[in-house]
Curated annotation (Swiss-Prot):
It holds the Pfam family LpxB. Belongs to the LpxB family. This is Lipid-A-disaccharide synthase. It catalyses: a lipid X + a UDP-2-N,3-O-bis[(3R)-3-hydroxyacyl]-alpha-D-glucosamine = a lipid A disaccharide + UDP + H(+). Gene3D superfamilies: Glycogen Phosphorylase B (3.40.50.2000). The keyword Lipid metabolism applies. Condensation of UDP-2,3-diacylglucosamine and 2,3-diacylglucosamine-1-phosphate to form lipid A disaccharide, a precursor of lipid A, a phosphorylated glycolipid that anchors the lipopolysaccharide to the outer membrane of the cell. One of its GO terms (molecular function) is lipid-A-disaccharide synthase activity. PANTHER family: LIPID-A-DISACCHARIDE SYNTHASE, LIPID-A-DISACCHARIDE SYNTHASE, MITOCHONDRIAL-RELATED. The gene is lpxB. Keywords: Glycosyltransferase, Lipid A biosynthesis, Lipid biosynthesis, Lipid metabolism, Transferase. Its EC number is 2.4.1.182. Disulfide bonds: none annotated. Pathway: Bacterial outer membrane biogenesis; LPS lipid A biosynthesis.
């Protein structure tokens, strides 16, 4: 009687909500590409778990932002990484896929690769935006890099890292022409009149730092445009509670807070005031004028300023290679500055048409059927491993 082959085992780690989205997309592609019975496990969030992923540790334990802010969490995070490394070395997977979270994943991928376990990393860290030798760390840790932006592959291949451009799953998910009126109907918002979506972040540290400034800016804008309304998505009940003191201190605001549905809220808007992050790419794919902002603690900001060499932080500007939307950061992010810039984005119809053209071209470049393309690369890495002597 012939022995049945062991099922494939795909270990994955995602450490952020944006990574959970990317990993869930990849899992959809893998389940249609790899044999039935393939096991998927590791560290993941709710979107991954919804696909049948077995999360050994909660993703939230890794979801910490900022150099200084992360220090107090380091012992717990290292403990999780060491335990997962022990498990994976004891029972090697067919492949390990790290999704974003480079500081955590590269430290795990390196020893796994040294032990002969093939490693794939999904989302190249910003080697094109930061100084330093991170690309050397990538070369030691990663067998194959899945790139979501087209200009990344040449940089990696020059350093000897195999890389494939797979596009960005958000570009597959978001329609080329957003349905603004449909989004307003779905959220119960009025069909006429200007609406600004405001997204101050999802962590307490972010809300504490920039939330009061965003709310003060909203009040200034409404004073200048009395018929203006705002929509703000709260991803979780905990975030809604964090926002409550700010909402209570601005009782006159025409503000609707939605339960999640960030993409729908942005689709419904005429312009967006948004904290820097992946959500700015989502806003660009929705063809929306926007103002990008952030505030981080002083020391974190100094470290970021010294490490970075691109003049912009927002993904729409990085992808365009120039400032196409304003960025107002750190101490420059006053309520007045944000209000003036956001109202200008709202009112300038020529700028709106220009941005629509730029963002539509960007959308076509990023729309690559990412889930299937990424799954094909992972499957090929597994096949190569099978062929090793």
């Amino acid at each position: 009687m012939a022995l049945q082959p062991s099922p494939l085992r795909v270990a994955m780690v995602a450490g952020e909500p944006s990574g959970d989205l990317l990993a869930a997309s990849l899992l959809d592609g893998l389940t249609s590409r790899l044999p039935a019975g393939t096991q998927y496990y590791g560290i993941g969030g709710p979107r991954m778990i919804a696909t049948g992923f077995d999360a050994h540790f909660p993703m939230e334990k890794l979801s910490v932002r900022g150099y200084v802010e992360a220090l107090k969490h380091i012992p717990g995070i290292l403990g999780i990484r060491n335990e997962l490394k022990r498990q994976l070395l004891a029972e090697p997977p067919s492949v390990f896929v790290g999704v974003d979270a480079p500081d955590f994943n590269f430290g795990l991928e390196h020893p796994l690769r040294e032990a002969g376990i093939p490693t794939v990393h999904f989302v190249c860290p910003s080697i094109w935006a930061w100084r330093g030798g991170r690309i050397k760390k990538i070369a030691k840790a990663v067998d194959h890099m899945l790139c979501v932006f087209p200009f990344e592959t040449a940089l990696l291949e020059k350093a000897g890292v195999a890389a494939s451009y797979v596009g960005h799953p958000l570009a597959d998910e978001i329609p080329l022409v957003p349905d603004t009126l449909g989004a307003r109907r779905a959220l119960g918002l009025a069909q006429d009149g200007p609406i600004i979506a405001v997204l101050p972040g999802s962590r307490r540290s972010e809300i504490d730092l920039i939330g009061p400034t965003f709310f003060a800016a909203m009040e200034m804008m409404q004073h200048q445009e009395p018929n203006l309304r705002f929509v703000m998505p709260a991803a979780t009940p905990a975030l809604r509670e964090m926002l409550r003191p700010l909402v209570d201190s601005h009782p006159g605001l025409a503000l609707t807070i939605t339960d999640g549905q960030a993409q729908l809220a942005m689709t419904a808007a005429d312009a967006i005031l948004v904290k820097s992050g992946t959500v700015t790419l989502e806003a660009a794919l929705l063809k929306k004028p926007m103002v990008i902002s952030y505030k981080v603690p002083w020391l974190t900001g100094q470290i970021m300023r010294r490490q970075g060499y691109l003049p912009y932080v927002g993904l729409p500007n990085i992808l365009a290679g120039r400032f196409v939307v304003p960025e107002i950061l750190q101490h420059f992010a006053t309520p007045q500055a944000l209000a003036e810039a956001t109202l200008k984005q709202l009112r300038d119809e020529t700028n709106r048409r220009t941005l629509t053209e730029i963002f539509t071209e960007m959308h076509h470049v990023l729309k690559q059927n990412t889930a299937q393309r990424a799954a094909e690369v992972v499957a090929s890495v597994i096949e190569k491993r099978k062929g090793r002597p």
